[in-house]
């Protein structure tokens, strides 16, 4: 595949956080998730802009599983929650942090998602499950003339896929 000029390309690192690695085994670990930093850094070399998204959750989130609500069981009554999850990516914890090898200062734009207790978005472009409340990522890319986005990250079945 022929890539356009670098000025039209952005690299988007999606949820490359410890919460999705064996570093945090009680959260949502992805096997070898802590080893992807070199590849994310390599793909960023093709781009003029680098973006990141991070889950940024509260300890009071309504979707956190517990003794009465097992992980992956449905939630009703909240339009921006679908299922229960183990606590993960809690702000101020090791799980919230980027995986080793990623430099927070290297990013031109960051999306923090899931801050509200009654929302658990998966993709990095919208704060809600109906894709109506923008995070600003699409607008940021558009105003910089970006036509191609190279995506990589963790939780490919939810977060990367929905981005």
Predicted regions and their residues:
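Active-site alpha/beta core segments
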Residues: 38-148
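Short glycine-enriched, charge-decorated loop/helix-capping segments at active-site entrances
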Residues: 24-32, 124-128
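Extreme N-terminal starter segment of soluble prokaryotic enzymes
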Residues: 4-10
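Short acidic, Gly/Ser-rich segments with clustered Asp/Glu that frequently serve as metal-coordination loops
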Residues: 16-23
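Conserved beta-strand elements of the Class I
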Residues: 10-12, 150
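Active-site flanking residues adjacent to catalytic metal/cofactor-binding acidic residues
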Residues: 12-14, 54
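Short, glycine/serine-rich, charged loops/turns that create anion-binding
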Residues: 18, 55-57, 115, 155-158
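Glycine-rich anion-binding loop/nest that anchors nucleotide
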Residues: 146-162
């Amino acid at each position: 595949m022929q890539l356009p000029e670098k000025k039209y390309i952005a690299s988007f690192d999606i949820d490359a956080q410890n919460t999705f690695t064996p570093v945090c085994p009680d959260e949502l670990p992805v096997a070898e998730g802590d080893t992807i930093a070199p590849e994310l850094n390599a793909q960023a070399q093709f781009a003029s802009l680098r973006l990141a998204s991070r889950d940024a959750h509260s300890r009071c989130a309504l979707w956190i599983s517990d003794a009465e609500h097992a992980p992956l069981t449905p939630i009703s009554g909240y339009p921006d929650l679908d299922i229960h999850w183990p606590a993960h990516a809690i702000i101020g914890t090791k799980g919230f942090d980027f995986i080793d090898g990623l430099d927070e200062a290297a990013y031109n734009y960051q999306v923090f998602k899931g801050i509200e207790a009654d929302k658990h978005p998966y993709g990095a472009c919208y704060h809600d499950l109906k894709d109506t409340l923008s995070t600003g990522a699409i607008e940021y890319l558009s105003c910089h003339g970006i036509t191609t986005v190279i995506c990589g990250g963790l939780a490919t079945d939810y977060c990367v896929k929905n981005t």
